[in-house]
Amino acid sequence: MTKVITRFAPSPTGMLHVGNIRAALLNWLYAKKHDGQFILRFDDTDLERSKQEYKDAIRADLKFLNLNWDQTFNQLSRLSRYDEIKKLLLDKKRLYACYETPEELELKRKFQLSKGLPPIYDRAALNLTEDQIQKYIEQGRKPHYRFLVNHEPITWHDMIKGEVKYEGKALSDPIVIRADGSMTYMLCSVIDDVDYEITHIIRGEDHVSNTAIQIQMFEALDKYPPTFGHLSLIINKDEKISKRVGGFEIATLREEVGLEAMAIASFFSLLGSSAQIIPHKKMDELVKHFEISSFSKSPTIYQPEDLERLNHKLLISLEFNEVKDRLKEIDAEYIDENFWLSVRPNLKKLFDAKDWWEICHKTPNIQDLNLDKEYLKQAAELLPEEEITTETWGIWTKKLAAITNRKGKELFLPLRLALTGKESGPEISKVLPLIKREEIVKRLT
């Protein structure tokens, strides 16, 4: 049986966003589900926009999400190989030279659109005479090269979309080699997939027409194409998510929003599938339950608040031994099990635990809250003398209610504000033992 090999091929022209990390996750999960390999490839042939800092950031995001790769390479290291294939396809008459300028091509495109026609290249370059070509060369024009798409039906069985069919005549011959000699994504990707024996490719449905053309490229190289799966796009309200939209970068979710890796991995590996989106603590659990056939063909709506809720669900499920190392990573190794269990139910982000530590160990500033000082003084006097435990709050407030005739918010809220500086948070009955008696009295008086 053929070994499953998948790949993730980002362009290092920006940060990873939730759309392409979803593709990375599903390719990784599919490979691991079938005891296969996962390859990281950098599509860096766009010399002007590709940057080393983006490569480093992409690696950091993948490592954060525990998406370890078995091999990695970048396309710039394979230029001589691409040149070999260029010569082969020229000999096979599947590549042809074109001499139009970008301005001329844009005029053609606008003319076609004005006539209600699809902007498909008219293959004028195939009819150039030797004299015309020589004239272009004398003008200093350098050729770009297009791949000749056969005008025949292109069909494949998609892992998600089912049977897909394209008419070759409805596709425009893509530019695969630019006038400066650099190669575009389309052909390089196919050459890499052949050489690295990629068996399965899972990517967004915005690549479907590319897939139709690339299947012909595989055939032109006398190779079988991989099995493809095209994911429905992630949309936020009315906008497709991409790196140009911004605001959905994995680095932002990690560093600024403060979400856990397994919350992000759980959410985006299940989003758009028929499976219930629940937090998983380990990648092995996601691998075990992963089924590519469960993904829908319909667009998937991404609501950031859903991801944040999942992060909360993950945190409240973590025992202290499961979160201890993460606390060290955020410089909160001073948090012990008792404190963790007390504040855990109210944590939206792990960093919130540090905030609650500060609240319990540093007197909050409540000068601007206009609290009833007489009531707080009375509360301090009625604080039980016994050791402060989780039972203290109930005993204390019951006594206060009897003496002051206060109840509900009027009874509890001033105490919470005085003790924590916040209107909401962990149960005060659990927080109270974390604050020293002297500190409780100090905050009340």
Curated annotation (Swiss-Prot):
Subcellular location: Cytoplasm
Gene Ontology cellular component terms for the protein in this record: cytoplasm
Motif position, 'KMSKS' region: 240-244
Function: Catalyzes the attachment of glutamate to tRNA(Glu) in a two-step reaction: glutamate is first activated by ATP to form Glu-AMP and then transferred to the acceptor end of tRNA(Glu).
Protein name per the record: Glutamate--tRNA ligase 1
Principal location: cytoplasm
GO molecular function: ATP binding; glutamate-tRNA ligase activity; tRNA binding
NCBIfam families from the UniProt entry: gltX_bact (TIGR00464)
